[in-house]
């Protein structure tokens, strides 16, 4: 993702994700949707989002004493927000208010997660993505507050 090679042949590899954790399958779907969006393939991005929504809808409930893994939900909200932003017709600075609201929901979910060791569980931390969206829209006063939490 950080290389921003949205047309990389590796994105077309068929990888068997049967039996992987929901967060790992969600990461794959998020990257597929995001790369499609970055290539200008809105239908492909919407297909990735639909698959991500289906994954989240069909996840088994957590075991007793365990909490639901929020990473797949965060990734879904991030991809939804990016699609809304790409759709244009926004509010302040060109960012649709519903895209910002989705990102605020994603940041709230992320903030409530326990701190993990190692790299972030999601490929694009929600505060970072919200900050980038606000900066791209020219909302310079709002963006630093979003990124301070990273």
Each language-model region and where it sits:
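Solenoid-like repeat scaffolds
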Residues: 12-23, 53-68, 107-119, 148-150
């Amino acid at each position: 993702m950080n290389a921003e090679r949205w047309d990389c042949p590796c994105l077309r590899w068929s990888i068997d994700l049967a039996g992987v954790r929901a967060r790992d399958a969600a990461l794959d779907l998020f990257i597929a949707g995001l790369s499609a969006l970055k290539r200008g393939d809105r239908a492909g991005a919407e297909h990735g989002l639909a698959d991500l929504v289906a994954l989240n809808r069909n996840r088994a409930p957590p075991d007793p004493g365990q909490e639901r893994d929020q990473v797949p939900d965060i990734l879904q909200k991030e991809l939804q927000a990016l699609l809304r932003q790409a759709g244009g017709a926004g509010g302040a600075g060109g960012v649709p208010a519903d895209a910002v609201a989705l990102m605020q929901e994603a940041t709230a979910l992320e903030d409530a997660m326990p701190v993990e060791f190692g790299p972030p569980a999601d490929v694009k931390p929600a505060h970072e993505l919200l900050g980038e969206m606000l900066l791209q829209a020219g909302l310079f006063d709002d963006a630093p507050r979003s990124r301070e939490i990273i």
